[in-house]
Amino acid sequence: MRKLRCEWEKTLEGAANRGVKQRAYDALRGLQQCRFEGGDRVSVSTSHARTGYSPEAVAEHAMALAMAVNRHLHKAYMRVRENNFSLQGLTGMNFYGKTAGIVGTGKIGAAMARICHGFGMKVIAYDMYQSPDLDFVTYVELDELLATSDLISLHCPLMESTHHMINIDTINKMKDGVILVNTSRGGLVKTDDLIAGIRERKFFGVGLDVYEEETQNVYTRTARMTS
């Protein structure tokens, strides 16, 4: 991470020397991913570029991860490549009639809620601000969502109040065999606690599109944990 920051510092300083006063990042990238110490030494401000990104695309990706986990698509793919068509260990569950817990019902979370509703799932959600457009959603406290959801999908920003919101305590409150999906921010999940939960088989499966410290965790400690 320090090496990455040094590279960004060089880039920013070079831009400032060429008269750049503003840097903008696309709306899908959290500004916490773009912070580094060099920003204090040069006069280049940072802002979001509110481009026309698709909340539905992110939500569809979240459901794709959930489906891949549920139906063991990664295992099935590898087996078929080896001419192995055994169904042993590939049984999932029907999402129909199950409970989906959506943490954060902004644009992406709301899109995910609609997708889950279309699957015939009961949709519950946790958010400080309840959306009046989601009349099929029941808002509950976080503890209730954790305890009753078969699928939990994270769609909230990374702030001090949400940092490591998925930790050993909240994991222990979840149902055994829950599916957890995170397409929001890696820092929402405490990596060590998640790994412990996976090893203890708390989860049916986990689908992650973001990681807290990718260079430290993804390619080393978790490289052999695919199951």
What are the functions of these language-model segments?
Residues 47-48, 168, 177-227:
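Rossmann-like dinucleotide-binding domain for NAD(H)/NADP(H)
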Residues 88-176:
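Rossmann-like dinucleotide/phosphate-binding beta-alpha-beta segment
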